[in-house]
Each structure stands twice: as C-alpha cells, then as structure tokens.
Swiss-Prot record:
Contributes to protect fish blood from freezing at subzero sea water temperatures. Lowers the blood freezing point. Binds to nascent ice crystals and prevents further growth. InterPro entries: Antifreeze_1. It comes from the Eukaryota. It is found in: Secreted. Keywords: Antifreeze protein, Repeat, Secreted, Signal. Residues 1-21 form the signal peptide. Belongs to the type-I AFP family. This is Ice-structuring protein 4. GO terms for cellular component: extracellular region. The keyword Repeat applies. The lineage of its organism: Eukaryota, Metazoa, Chordata, Craniata, Vertebrata. GO terms for molecular function: antifreeze activity. Coiled coil: none annotated. Transmembrane segments: none annotated.
Length: 85
C-alpha cells in the first residue's frame, strides 16, 4: 500500500505574494531600525553625560564646602592658639 499525503498540514499557510517583502522595503526597514537604534544610543549617551556632569558638579560642591569648613576650623584653631599665647 502506498501512502501519499492527501491532506496537507492545515496549520501550514501559504504566504501571499503581496505580503512578501521587497528588497527595497527590507532596506528601508533596516535603515529605519538603524536610525532608531542610533537615536536611542545618542539619547542614552547624552543622558549618561548629563548624569556624569551633575555628579561631578555635586562632588565639586561637596569638596568646596568641606574645604571651606576645614579652612574655617583651622582659622578658629589658630585664633584659639594665638589667644592662649
């Protein structure tokens, strides 16, 4: 007895010719995806740079405040030592 496939797989669906993407549309989609990726990378880089600049500014402000506090403490200690003679 010879077995033949009389009933093809019902889940297999043929792709209509109109749905098949053309080379031009593939290239356009790839270009759009590349542009979107580049834009996202640029935005992430800008956000990272802004965060780094803010952190650097905050660190500089803290360092300046500590330096001023240390200078004031040193001046007070010097004045106290001078007052003691």
């Amino acid at each position: 007895m010879r077995i033949t496939e009389a009933n093809p797989d019902p889940d297999a669906k043929a792709v209509p010719a109109a749905a098949a993407p053309s080379t031009a549309s593939d290239a356009a989609a790839a270009a759009a995806a590349t542009a979107a990726t580049a834009a996202a990378a640029a935005a992430a880089t800008a956000a990272t740079a802004a965060a780094a600049a803010a952190a650097t500014a905050a660190t500089a402000a803290k360092a300046a405040a500590l330096t001023a506090a240390n200078a004031a403490a040193a001046a007070a200690a010097t004045a106290a030592a001078a007052a003691r003679g």
